[in-house]
Amino acid sequence: CSYGFMDDTVKAGEKYPNKLFMHCSGYKQSANVGTYFADLYQMYYLNGLMAGALTKSNRIGYVGAFPTPEVVRHIDAYALGVMATNPKAKVEVRWIYSWFDPQKAKEAAEALVAAGVDCLAFTEDTQSVVQVAEEHTAAGKQIYSFSHYSAMQKYGENSCVSGQLVDWGVMYVKIFEDIKAGKWTNADMWWLSGDKAAVLGGEFGVPINPKFVDALKTKVVLTADL
């Protein structure tokens, strides 16, 4: 279940107390309702490093679904990455107030490009932002993009630099193993890159689109954290 089903999942747990429920991305637990999520801030930071290195306009765009802790965390990590490679760049956010609305996502991305942005990232569940970047790139204006959750590089072969991917299977196997072993708890489960659930790339097995590797290699980063 995703964020919008959080309260209903808790209600289902109350209705069926002898069943176990797991809610993805929420924060409410009960005796038989647990939560889990792939925490992608590490990947967003790495994406931000790339965006800061590639931008020519020093204006970075972000399309956000809702200002929830999850999305704000993504934006903060992305902005910190941008700052590390390009302190002059600014991150501009457009909210669409929807998890899935291809048209709103497209309009927000187009508005950011019209405002001078040349890098786009997002937290919403469509490929619209990547497609907008690809369309502008095909028309002669290079716009860089970063996919979100799913493998979206196929929608932006000439614009999608990298992204964040989730291997949900790793989490599900662990959850069912804990249930089978009688070790399940309702504690919040966070999965990072070290857990192999949060993965860097616009498609699995390709951390960085090969078309942008040479350009990224020209950027030298000298910061304390790197």
Predicted feature locations:
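A residue-level marker of the well-folded mature domains of exported/periplasmic proteins
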Residues: 1-226
